[in-house]
From Swiss-Prot:
Entry keywords, A to Z: Early protein, Signal
Record-given protein name: Protein MGF 110-14L
Similarity comment text for this entry: Belongs to the asfivirus MGF 110 family.
Organism: African swine fever virus (isolate Portugal/Lis 57/1957)
Matching InterPro entries: ASFV_fam_110
Signal peptide: 1-17
Source species, domain of life: Viruses
Length: 121
């Protein structure tokens, strides 16, 4: 249910994406946009609250452990003129992930690093 709520919130932000101004490159997107940015690259560090290696997702409240391998540093930005949203993802091999803001798609590059609480898959 929490995942569905997160997706619905992300969708509502998506609907408004064409009305949103440029977002300068940042590691701290506006709180009102977290559900959008965290839906498509859930591994981004700004999506998580971590204490003592145990991390809690800010949107879904799911928990993961081993933040050194699960969470990646991200910067995001949006160009309102071209309607492009871009992630700069720093993990073992830094890369860029871009998508049309109005036609987003999930990033599938780092799921292998996600380790769930309790060591499960």
């Amino acid at each position: 249910m929490k995942v569905l709520l997160g997706l619905l919130l992300g969708y509502s932000v998506l609907i408004l994406a064409h009305e949103l101004p440029d977002l300068p490159r940042t590691q701290h997107p506006p709180k009102s946009e977290l559900s959008y940015w965290c839906t498509y690259v859930p591994q981004c560090d700004f999506c998580w609250d971590c204490q003592d290696g145990i991390c809690k997702n800010k949107i879904t409240e799911s928990r993961f452990i081993d933040s050194n391998h699960s969470i990646v540093n991200c910067r995001v930005f949006r160009n309102s003129m071209t309607q492009s949203c871009l992630y700069e993802i720093s993990s073992k091999m830094p890369n860029h992930f871009s998508m049309e803001c109005l036609h987003p798609r999930p990033y599938t590059g780092n799921e292998i690093f996600m380790r769930t609480w309790g060591g499960g898959g």
